[in-house]
């Protein structure tokens, strides 16, 4: 048991006819409290410890603390000031008193403290004002104790507590402890249990619905005249060819084109995901604000702009097929067509003229598709997936040339190595390096330290340094010998970026 000093300004409570009455002490009193309580001094939180390097006992903590506050018995012959009387009296017999939590007290000289979340002990040499924090069982005690705690008739082993995350341990134990004396918490626990039951019911319904959908799909019998091709859970129907009408042949060619376009897009997505898997660069928006989803690489300029936007929205599938087919057989015709489309879209300004251009393009596309449909199927089969993969590989190579400015730079690699050497593994070092590399010049980065980089990164995400990060030393990112090389690398990097633009 440790002691704290209580002045005449602190309110104490005692039971009287099933009600709490308030009193104050006339003279300073040394109040005994159990070790293990949390105390806030300034902005830091500490744990009161009875002896240094020895963890407190949780059983004594629970026996001396309740929802009303810290329990202690005041001896007789102590002068008190009763409520609403204004004069002082003396106790004729000992009185059981409750010191409420979140009250301001004085910690005397010699009080032993342990800083929360850090294995560091302190011994006070002067009186300090502190606030008893509203916490009964600190989470740091539960982690290291190998005892069984009896809460509402249920024993909780340390093995069970170690499986719960740190931020949940303290809340669960505090709720169970309050259920002894406060019946109001039962409604809160009921609502929590109801929400858990609802989530379980939803998961069961989803499983049942999946089984039902499987049964319905099995019972359906497809028509013999329609062929179904499956690609990644998407069905596309292909009608059989008929030589009677040219309209049927047009429909069949459109369906085959749509299936090939979907395959090409899927193959391109799968290949882009596999490339550059070793190094992941974060990207920023134009406003230089940090976001995890937006890429950090600069936007490419379209060196070869294609048709107008309206033309892409309306006939995107037809454009994909026609452009690929004409690039192989009729390159001159496709280039002339694109030039004509560009000149028409630039000259036209009014809405009426834009509609005319769209109608012309659609009519030209319909005529070209109808003429191509009369050709043999062997010419259409020449567009294989291998050619689409070659087109995708060419696009990926252009993207790698632009991002090589970040990866191949010596200073960028040094920055990554320094951050990985001094920062904790909980931070994503690649994200922090890219955020600093894009938003600040090399001259400013040379003057920064590891702690400066971390604080700037967290401020960009509307966060602040944690208590553990305050003890991080501000190591320099670059040595004095490396500063001469950084200017040259920065100029080379900027010239490469300008050339790519």
UniProtKB/Swiss-Prot annotation:
Residues 179-404, 480-501 are annotated as: Disordered. It comes from Acanthamoeba polyphaga mimivirus (APMV). Residues 191-200, 215-226, 304-316 have a biased composition (Basic and acidic residues). It comes from the Viruses. This is Uncharacterized protein L157. Residues 333-352 have a biased composition (Polar residues). Residues 231-274 have a biased composition (Low complexity). Residues 201-214 have a biased composition (Basic residues). Residues 379-403 have a biased composition (Acidic residues).
């Amino acid at each position: 048991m440790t002691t704290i000093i209580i002045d005449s300004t602190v309110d104490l409570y005692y039971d009287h006819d099933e009600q709490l009455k308030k009193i104050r002490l006339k003279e300073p009193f040394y109040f005994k409290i159990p070790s293990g309580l949390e105390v806030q001094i300034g902005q830091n939180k500490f744990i009161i410890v009875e002896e240094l390097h020895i963890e407190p006992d949780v059983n004594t903590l629970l026996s001396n603390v309740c929802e009303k506050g810290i329990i202690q018995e005041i001896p007789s012959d102590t002068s008190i000031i009763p409520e609403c009387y204004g004069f002082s009296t003396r106790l004729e017999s000992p009185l059981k008193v409750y010191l409420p939590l979140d009250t301001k007290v004085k910690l005397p000289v010699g009080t032993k403290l342990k800083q929360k979340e850090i294995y560091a002990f302190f011994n006070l040499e002067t009186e300090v004002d502190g606030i008893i924090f509203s916490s009964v069982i600190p989470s740091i005690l539960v982690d290291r104790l190998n005892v069984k705690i009896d809460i509402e008739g249920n024993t909780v082993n340390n093995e069970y507590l170690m499986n719960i995350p740190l931020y949940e341990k303290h809340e669960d134990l505090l709720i169970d402890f309050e259920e002894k004396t406060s019946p109001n918490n039962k409604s809160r626990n009921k609502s929590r249990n109801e929400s858990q039951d609802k989530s379980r019911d939803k998961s069961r319904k989803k499983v049942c619905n999946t089984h039902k959908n499987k049964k319905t799909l099995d019972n359906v019998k497809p028509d013999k005249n329609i062929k179904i091709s499956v690609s990644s859970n998407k069905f596309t129907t292909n009608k059989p060819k008929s030589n009677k009408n040219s309209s049927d042949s047009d429909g069949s060619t459109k369906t085959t084109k749509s299936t090939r376009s979907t395959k090409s897009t899927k193959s391109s997505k799968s290949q882009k995901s596999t490339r550059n898997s070793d190094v992941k660069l974060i990207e920023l928006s134009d406003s230089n604000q940090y976001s995890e989803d937006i890429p950090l690489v600069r936007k490419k300029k379209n060196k070869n702009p294609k048709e107008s936007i309206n033309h892409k929205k309306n006939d995107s599938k037809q454009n994909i097929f026609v452009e690929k087919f004409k690039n192989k057989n009729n390159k001159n015709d496709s280039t002339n067509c694109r030039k004509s489309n560009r000149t028409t879209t630039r000259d036209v300004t009014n809405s009426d003229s834009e509609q005319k251009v769209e109608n012309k393009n659609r009519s030209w596309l319909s005529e070209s598709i109808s003429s191509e449909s009369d050709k043999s199927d062997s010419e259409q089969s020449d567009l294989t997936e291998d050619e689409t993969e070659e087109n995708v590989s060419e696009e990926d190579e252009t993207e790698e040339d632009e991002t090589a400015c970040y990866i191949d730079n010596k200073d960028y690699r040094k920055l990554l190595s320094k951050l990985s050497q001094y920062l904790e593994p909980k931070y994503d070092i690649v994200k922090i390096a890219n955020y600093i590399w894009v938003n600040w010049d090399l001259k400013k980065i040379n003057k920064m330290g590891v702690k400066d980089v971390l604080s700037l990164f967290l401020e960009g995400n509307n966060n602040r340094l944690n208590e553990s990060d305050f003890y991080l030393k501000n190591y320099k990112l670059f040595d004095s010998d490396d500063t001469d090389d950084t200017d040259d690398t920065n100029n080379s990097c900027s010239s490469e970026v300008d050339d790519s633009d």
